[in-house]
């Protein structure tokens, strides 16, 4: 293994960690900076191209469960996590990635596969896989394409909509990378 490959691998690990840490802290601006300017994020909810679209999507995820306005007559049933968000607070959330496999294909292209767990103050919420592609941009390896695949989520939890808006207890998907 060449030194540049080791540097690429560590930069990619750092990129994945920054995505999680910034997202967990509600720093969406910094979270989105781990994507290339024309980066792509795919989830069960859709495909988002470019930092602006990814930012809008991430902001909508953070807003999930908030009532339209304080004077809304529409009754909104929220989970405890969504109630925290409705009060303008970032709840306790933590992303954990594990079993990350990185394939550095060239000096300009790499792929990674990771399992993730998403925890809230109530415990395990949902879990799945990230399938990522990376490229160096201005000397930093950034995500050019992230495909988030939710394998399972608990009904009523934050991630219940992560599989395209469905409230699910378990999703059946192939476990291969």
Predicted segments, located by residue:
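Short, low-complexity N-terminal intrinsically disordered segments enriched in polar/charged residues
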Residues: 1-29, 33-37, 49
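A structural preference for long, well-packed, hydrophobic secondary-structure segments
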Residues: 9-10, 18-22, 112-117, 127-128
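Short beta-strand edge/turn micro-motifs at domain boundaries
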Residues: 111-113, 127-160
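Hydrophobic/aromatic beta-strand elements that line small-molecule binding cavities or substrate pockets
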Residues: 97-102, 118, 129-135
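Acidic/histidine-enriched, glycine/proline-rich intrinsically disordered or flexible terminal extensions
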Residues: 154-177
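Solvent-exposed loop/turn segments connecting transmembrane beta-strands
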Residues: 122-124
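A solvent-exposed, acidic/Ser-Thr-rich amphipathic alpha-helical stretch
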Residues: 28-114
């Amino acid at each position: 293994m060449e030194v540049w490959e080791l540097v690429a691998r560590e930069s990619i690990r750092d990129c994945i960690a920054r995505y999680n840490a910034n997202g967990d802290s509600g720093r969406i601006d910094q979270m989105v900076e781990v994507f290339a300017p024309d980066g792509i994020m795919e989830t069960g909810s859709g495909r988002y191209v470019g930092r602006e679209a990814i930012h809008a999507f991430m902001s909508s995820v953070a807003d999930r469960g908030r009532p339209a306005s304080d004077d809304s007559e529409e009754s909104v049933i929220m989970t405890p996590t969504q109630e925290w968000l409705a009060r303008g607070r970032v709840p306790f959330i933590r992303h954990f990635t594990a079993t990350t496999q990185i394939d550095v294909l060239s000096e300009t292209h790499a792929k990674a596969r990771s399992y993730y767990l998403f925890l809230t103050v109530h415990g395990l919420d949902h879990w799945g896989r990230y399938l990522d592609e990376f490229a160096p941009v201005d000397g930093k390896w950034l995500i050019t394409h992230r495909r988030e695949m939710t394998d399972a989520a608990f009904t009523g939890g934050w991630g219940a909509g992560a599989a395209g808006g469905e409230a699910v207890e378990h999703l059946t998907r192939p476990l291969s990378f």
